Amino acid sequence: MTPFLLFLTFFCAGPLTLQALGASPSTPLSEDRIQVRLRQMLDVPDSVRGSVSLDLKSVTLAAMMRSDSFRSLLSKIPMIPVDRLEQEVLTDATLFAQGKQEWNRNQPNSLFGTNRFDQTSMDVGVEKRLASGTKLTLGLSEFRNNSAFGSFGNVDSKVAGGRLNLSQSLWRDFFGSSTRKLLDSGKAKSEAKKIELESEIEDWFLQLSGLFHQVWMAQKRIEATRASLERKERLAGLFARRKSLGISEEAEQIQVESAVKQTRVQLEEMTRLLEKQWSLLVVSLKLGEEDRRTDPTLIPVHLETALSEPAKDCADPVDSNRDIRQLELELSALQLQSGVALDQARPELLLDLGISTNGSVLNAADEFQTRWLNTLTARFPAYTIGFGFRLPLDASIEKSRILSSLSMTRQLESQLSDLRARMISTLDTSCAELAMLGRHYRLYDGIERDMKKRIKLEETRYRQARSSPFSVLQAGDELYGTTLSLHTTLAEWWNRHWSLKKTKGLLFQELDAWVSEKTGKSIFSNASAGNMP
């Protein structure tokens, strides 16, 4: 037997397996076992009938529930309200309480002084600053005194007291203008952090979707390469019969042998690439060793081929883009803080108002009801009014804060203007490319159908000795290239589609809708409830 016939015997004896190609051994699983693993992997309920395949939505939801990378993102959720809470400290209520016991045996310094004075005092109340810049203090107190005045004897008294004090800024924090700016700046910063996290989740999804498309594309390359190898092996069989009749040349033999060998090498390389990308996807989904060692060519991976028109997404402005919104909120917070710095450089004019009342009982065992009734009904009131004025002569700290805020504001304004211009340009480019990819996909789909007809015609002509092996190989290679272009265009279309969604600020809403559809809650609600890692 000639070397060429040995070569044909090896390649035509049966279908080419991964083990024959030198691929790493993988766990042999039946189709039923693969379906069981997929259902476990994707948390598919038993009520869902039919076969299950990996699609981008199911992979994304599984990764959200399992992956360490997504868990790392969710760990930032508790940091979102920090800036808002730091500013709300200004309006937090404070409860205070204190008590004191005094035993005084000092020598009297006058004829009417006491030579013994014992006092027990207790004071409790609450302080709060309102958003109007008003500081309120409400307090209740109790004093019990026992005094000895020499020959005059002992005097016992019990005094209850109440007070309400109000302090209002009339200039620097004019009826809370500066306080509200601080509160609003904290809210803007927290909202900016939330949007920043949403943008990071979008970026995380784009990386995951890119990996998913690579796995799908690697499978399609292997399918196309196997089909190409089958065609070339079929051609080799036809060539062997013609050679036995003495109507083939050595150059044609070399050409056919080389084509089969090259395709075999391509198939091995693509198999290795698929195994590598499948391992990365398994890690992203935090699956087990059994899943990693499963033959990835047996996993059904689905990518939608019905392409939508991007006209609607391209018509809307980019103002909802999360990067733009984040910068706008950061700029708003900075402008509010600049206003606070200007306020702090102004003079301070304070108005203080107060009302106090008391109830006192002398030399009585315990008249609790009497003294507190007098206190709470303000039977014996006292009123105070006062003004205070402070003028900063240098205000060095305030000046430094104003200059710093002014510089940072100008930087953010420039960044925002540049980002908005770049996003508009990116939107126009993405829309044009997306429309082009959609047209190309439809063209490649038609070309592939035509090329399949052509390869059949070329093989028929070769059987009839009306064509050469080169023509058959060329037709097969052109079909192979067209098929790869078709699948590459589809994967690229989906990559651009999701990138366009991010540019428009619509991607996170879609991801949130996926999670809500599965769990009934949003991403952040699930994370807060502990339903996500």
Positions of PLM-derived features:
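Bacterial N-terminal signal peptides
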Residues: 3-15
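Acidic, low-complexity, intrinsically disordered peripheral segments
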Residues: 17-36, 40-46, 105, 279-297, ...
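Regulatory alphaC helix of protein kinase catalytic domains
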Residues: 37-62
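Small/polar, glycine/serine/threonine/aspartate-rich low-complexity segments that form flexible
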Residues: 47-51, 99-168, 299-306, 338-339, ...
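Sec/SRP-type N-terminal targeting helices
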Residues: 71-79, 88, 131-156, 171-196, ...
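Amphipathic alpha-helical coiled-coil scaffold segments and their short linker/junction regions
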Residues: 127, 187, 248, 252-253, ...
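Periplasmic alpha-helical coiled-coil/stalk elements that build and connect Gram-negative outer-membrane
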Residues: 194-318, 433, 437, 457, ...
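A short glycine-centered flexible hinge/capping loop motif at secondary-structure junctions
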Residues: 243-250, 462-466, 503, 507
